[in-house]
Amino acid sequence: MKIAYAVGLALLVAAPAAPAMKVEVQTSPGTSYPVKMTSLKEARFRNTVRQKYDFSCGSAAVATLLTYQYGDPIDEQSAFDIMYEHGDQAKIGKEGFSLLDIKRFLASRGFQADGFDVPLERLEVEGVPAIVLINERGYHHFVVVKGYKKGRVLLGDPARGTRAMSRRRFDALWTNRIVFVIHNERDRAIFNSPRDWAVAPAAPIAEGIERNGLGPIVMPKRGPGDI
Protein backbone atom coordinates (compact mmCIF):
# COMPACT_ATOMS: atom_id res chain seq x y z
CA MET A 1 0.00 0.00 0.00
CA LYS A 2 2.96 2.33 0.53
CA ILE A 3 3.82 1.88 -3.14
CA ALA A 4 0.27 2.68 -4.18
CA TYR A 5 0.22 5.78 -1.97
CA ALA A 6 3.56 7.03 -3.32
CA VAL A 7 2.50 6.51 -6.93
CA GLY A 8 -0.85 8.15 -6.31
CA LEU A 9 0.71 11.16 -4.62
CA ALA A 10 3.18 11.60 -7.47
CA LEU A 11 0.40 11.53 -10.05
CA LEU A 12 -1.70 13.94 -8.02
CA VAL A 13 1.06 16.52 -7.82
CA ALA A 14 2.44 16.01 -11.30
CA ALA A 15 -0.84 16.70 -13.09
CA PRO A 16 -2.51 19.61 -11.28
CA ALA A 17 -4.76 20.58 -14.20
CA ALA A 18 -5.66 17.12 -15.47
CA PRO A 19 -9.24 15.85 -15.16
CA ALA A 20 -10.16 12.78 -13.12
CA MET A 21 -8.74 9.62 -14.67
CA LYS A 22 -8.11 5.96 -13.90
CA VAL A 23 -4.58 4.60 -13.65
CA GLU A 24 -3.24 1.13 -12.99
CA VAL A 25 -1.22 0.94 -9.77
CA GLN A 26 1.02 -2.11 -9.36
CA THR A 27 1.26 -3.27 -5.75
CA SER A 28 3.22 -6.47 -6.38
CA PRO A 29 4.58 -8.31 -9.44
CA GLY A 30 1.65 -9.34 -11.59
CA THR A 31 -0.92 -7.55 -9.44
CA SER A 32 -2.42 -4.16 -10.20
CA TYR A 33 -5.54 -2.25 -9.29
CA PRO A 34 -7.39 0.53 -11.13
CA VAL A 35 -7.31 3.72 -9.07
CA LYS A 36 -9.34 6.82 -9.89
CA MET A 37 -7.11 9.88 -9.64
CA THR A 38 -8.31 13.45 -9.19
CA SER A 39 -5.92 16.35 -9.62
CA LEU A 40 -5.49 18.84 -6.79
CA LYS A 41 -6.78 21.63 -9.00
CA GLU A 42 -9.92 19.68 -9.87
CA ALA A 43 -10.49 18.73 -6.23
CA ARG A 44 -10.26 22.36 -5.12
CA PHE A 45 -13.10 23.30 -7.45
CA ARG A 46 -15.29 20.36 -6.49
CA ASN A 47 -17.22 22.43 -3.93
CA THR A 48 -16.32 25.91 -5.14
CA VAL A 49 -17.68 27.52 -8.32
CA ARG A 50 -14.94 28.79 -10.62
CA GLN A 51 -15.39 32.34 -11.93
CA LYS A 52 -15.53 32.68 -15.73
CA TYR A 53 -14.61 36.36 -15.98
CA ASP A 54 -12.15 38.67 -14.25
CA PHE A 55 -14.99 40.70 -12.72
CA SER A 56 -17.39 37.85 -11.90
CA CYS A 57 -16.06 36.71 -8.53
CA GLY A 58 -19.26 38.07 -6.96
CA SER A 59 -21.56 35.85 -9.00
CA ALA A 60 -19.27 32.84 -8.53
CA ALA A 61 -19.10 33.48 -4.78
CA VAL A 62 -22.88 33.65 -4.43
CA ALA A 63 -23.25 30.52 -6.59
CA THR A 64 -20.78 28.76 -4.28
CA LEU A 65 -22.64 29.95 -1.19
CA LEU A 66 -26.03 28.79 -2.43
CA THR A 67 -24.98 25.56 -4.12
CA TYR A 68 -22.54 24.13 -1.59
CA GLN A 69 -23.33 25.88 1.71
CA TYR A 70 -27.15 26.04 1.47
CA GLY A 71 -28.10 23.21 -0.89
CA ASP A 72 -29.75 25.56 -3.41
CA PRO A 73 -27.95 24.74 -6.68
CA ILE A 74 -27.31 27.51 -9.20
CA ASP A 75 -24.54 27.95 -11.75
CA GLU A 76 -22.43 31.07 -12.03
CA GLN A 77 -23.80 32.09 -15.42
CA SER A 78 -27.39 32.14 -14.16
CA ALA A 79 -26.43 34.18 -11.09
CA PHE A 80 -24.35 36.51 -13.27
CA ASP A 81 -27.13 37.09 -15.80
CA ILE A 82 -29.76 37.89 -13.17
CA MET A 83 -27.55 40.23 -11.13
CA TYR A 84 -26.27 41.95 -14.26
CA GLU A 85 -29.78 42.46 -15.63
CA HIS A 86 -31.00 44.09 -12.42
CA GLY A 87 -27.82 45.98 -11.52
CA ASP A 88 -25.89 49.06 -12.64
CA GLN A 89 -24.37 47.50 -15.75
CA ALA A 90 -21.84 50.26 -16.42
CA LYS A 91 -20.55 50.04 -12.85
CA ILE A 92 -20.54 46.25 -12.89
CA GLY A 93 -18.47 46.26 -16.09
CA LYS A 94 -15.83 48.43 -14.38
CA GLU A 95 -15.90 47.26 -10.77
CA GLY A 96 -17.75 43.94 -10.69
CA PHE A 97 -20.73 43.12 -8.50
CA SER A 98 -21.35 44.77 -5.14
CA LEU A 99 -22.77 43.32 -1.94
CA LEU A 100 -25.97 45.21 -2.73
CA ASP A 101 -26.25 43.30 -6.02
CA ILE A 102 -25.72 40.04 -4.13
CA LYS A 103 -28.22 41.02 -1.41
CA ARG A 104 -30.94 41.73 -3.99
CA PHE A 105 -30.26 38.49 -5.82
CA LEU A 106 -30.44 36.44 -2.63
CA ALA A 107 -33.68 38.16 -1.64
CA SER A 108 -35.20 37.13 -4.98
CA ARG A 109 -34.56 33.51 -3.95
CA GLY A 110 -36.00 33.90 -0.46
CA PHE A 111 -32.73 34.44 1.44
CA GLN A 112 -32.36 37.39 3.81
CA ALA A 113 -28.74 38.58 3.91
CA ASP A 114 -26.86 41.53 5.36
CA GLY A 115 -23.35 42.63 6.21
CA PHE A 116 -22.19 42.63 9.84
CA ASP A 117 -19.10 43.96 11.56
CA VAL A 118 -18.40 40.97 13.81
CA PRO A 119 -15.30 38.90 14.60
CA LEU A 120 -14.66 35.78 12.56
CA GLU A 121 -15.23 33.61 15.63
CA ARG A 122 -18.91 34.52 15.46
CA LEU A 123 -19.27 32.46 12.29
CA GLU A 124 -17.88 29.42 14.10
CA VAL A 125 -20.26 29.93 17.02
CA GLU A 126 -23.31 30.44 14.79
CA GLY A 127 -22.27 27.78 12.28
CA VAL A 128 -22.97 29.93 9.23
CA PRO A 129 -20.81 30.62 6.15
CA ALA A 130 -20.22 34.12 4.82
CA ILE A 131 -19.12 36.06 1.78
CA VAL A 132 -16.24 38.42 2.52
CA LEU A 133 -14.22 40.88 0.47
CA ILE A 134 -10.46 40.44 0.61
CA ASN A 135 -7.67 42.53 -0.86
CA GLU A 136 -4.98 40.22 -2.22
CA ARG A 137 -2.06 41.56 -4.25
CA GLY A 138 -3.90 44.83 -4.79
CA TYR A 139 -7.10 43.23 -6.10
CA HIS A 140 -10.46 43.24 -4.32
CA HIS A 141 -11.99 39.80 -4.48
CA PHE A 142 -15.10 38.08 -3.08
CA VAL A 143 -14.60 34.69 -1.42
CA VAL A 144 -16.76 32.43 0.73
CA VAL A 145 -15.70 31.58 4.29
CA LYS A 146 -16.56 27.88 4.41
CA GLY A 147 -15.01 27.11 7.78
CA TYR A 148 -12.87 28.30 10.66
CA LYS A 149 -11.16 26.17 13.30
CA LYS A 150 -7.86 25.86 15.11
CA GLY A 151 -6.62 29.17 13.77
CA ARG A 152 -7.19 28.25 10.11
CA VAL A 153 -9.69 29.84 7.74
CA LEU A 154 -11.20 27.78 4.92
CA LEU A 155 -12.12 29.77 1.83
CA GLY A 156 -14.11 28.99 -1.29
CA ASP A 157 -12.12 31.15 -3.70
CA PRO A 158 -13.71 31.51 -7.18
CA ALA A 159 -10.26 32.11 -8.68
CA ARG A 160 -8.18 29.50 -6.83
CA GLY A 161 -10.67 26.97 -5.50
CA THR A 162 -11.09 25.79 -1.92
CA ARG A 163 -8.02 26.75 0.11
CA ALA A 164 -7.06 27.33 3.72
CA MET A 165 -4.82 29.90 5.34
CA SER A 166 -3.78 30.99 8.80
CA ARG A 167 -5.94 33.46 10.70
CA ARG A 168 -3.08 35.95 10.67
CA ARG A 169 -2.79 35.78 6.88
CA PHE A 170 -6.56 36.08 6.47
CA ASP A 171 -6.76 39.12 8.75
CA ALA A 172 -4.11 40.85 6.64
CA LEU A 173 -6.30 40.37 3.53
CA TRP A 174 -9.68 41.01 5.15
CA THR A 175 -9.40 44.75 5.59
CA ASN A 176 -13.03 45.89 5.95
CA ARG A 177 -13.93 43.32 8.65
CA ILE A 178 -17.45 42.83 7.21
CA VAL A 179 -19.06 39.39 6.96
CA PHE A 180 -22.02 39.09 4.61
CA VAL A 181 -24.27 36.32 5.87
CA ILE A 182 -27.69 34.82 5.27
CA HIS A 183 -29.61 35.16 8.53
CA ASN A 184 -32.65 33.06 7.75
CA GLU A 185 -32.67 29.43 6.62
CA ARG A 186 -30.21 28.67 9.42
CA ASP A 187 -31.05 24.97 9.42
CA ARG A 188 -29.76 24.68 5.85
CA ALA A 189 -26.36 26.27 6.49
CA ILE A 190 -23.24 24.13 6.04
CA PHE A 191 -20.10 25.34 7.84
CA ASN A 192 -16.88 23.51 8.73
CA SER A 193 -17.86 20.56 6.55
CA PRO A 194 -15.28 17.73 6.70
CA ARG A 195 -15.73 17.33 2.95
CA ASP A 196 -14.60 20.93 2.40
CA TRP A 197 -11.68 20.66 4.82
CA ALA A 198 -10.49 17.44 3.17
CA VAL A 199 -9.32 19.46 0.15
CA ALA A 200 -7.05 21.65 2.29
CA PRO A 201 -5.57 19.53 5.11
CA ALA A 202 -2.92 21.01 7.37
CA ALA A 203 0.58 19.78 6.65
CA PRO A 204 1.64 17.41 9.48
CA ILE A 205 5.00 19.13 9.94
CA ALA A 206 3.25 22.50 10.25
CA GLU A 207 1.24 21.12 13.16
CA GLY A 208 4.33 19.92 14.99
CA ILE A 209 6.88 22.72 14.54
CA GLU A 210 6.26 26.44 14.40
CA ARG A 211 8.32 28.30 11.81
CA ASN A 212 9.96 30.44 14.48
CA GLY A 213 10.80 27.28 16.39
CA LEU A 214 13.30 26.29 13.72
CA GLY A 215 15.47 29.31 14.49
CA PRO A 216 17.67 27.69 17.19
CA ILE A 217 18.22 24.56 15.09
CA VAL A 218 21.51 24.89 13.20
CA MET A 219 23.89 22.58 11.43
CA PRO A 220 27.17 22.10 13.36
CA LYS A 221 30.28 23.43 11.68
CA ARG A 222 32.59 20.51 10.96
CA GLY A 223 36.33 20.72 11.13
CA PRO A 224 38.98 19.04 8.99
CA GLY A 225 38.65 15.26 9.07
CA ASP A 226 35.08 15.31 10.40
CA ILE A 227 32.55 13.26 8.49
Where are these regions (language model features)?
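Low-complexity, Gly/Ser/Thr/Pro-rich intrinsically disordered linker/tail segments
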Residues: 176-227
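Conserved active-site-adjacent core of cysteine acyl-enzyme catalytic domains
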Residues: 22-42, 83-192
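Active-site-adjacent structural segments surrounding the nucleophilic cysteine of cysteine proteases
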Residues: 4, 16-85, 90, 204-208, ...
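Sec-dependent signal peptide recognition
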Residues: 2-8
